[in-house]
């Protein structure tokens, strides 16, 4: 892939790209605070607008960043839908055993801390696949959305497009994992 430099006036990115990344950063934490889902919608709309404007003006770097932002929101939504579909599928596969259903109802009505609920849910016979799928899809949604956002921000700092960031993308992944695993440990 061609490495686009953003040092000349034809390839500089404007403040709207930075605003898009700020919205994506907020959207990355939408599973903790559902109100932040609106930031994803705003980032999507802003990304489409910026992409159209960049295409009109022939600004390749800005176009690449706007496309990266749009793709990040759509990827997050796709991961959420696939995760929910998998959870529904595994839950259907578990069946509707009355004892299991009564235990699930008891857990969902409880006021225990989330980690305790997860431990009790894990103890239900046949629920391990569902717990693994729920935790895995949630972690993938949280980490991958934040990783792409941080990769975009790091690419702005390095003056390249997000896709041509190189080995620094691993730093974005490491930061995303540390943030998304660290926040629940602090909050829970």
Provide a role label for each language-model segment:
Residues 2-188:
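Alpha-helical membrane insertion/targeting regions
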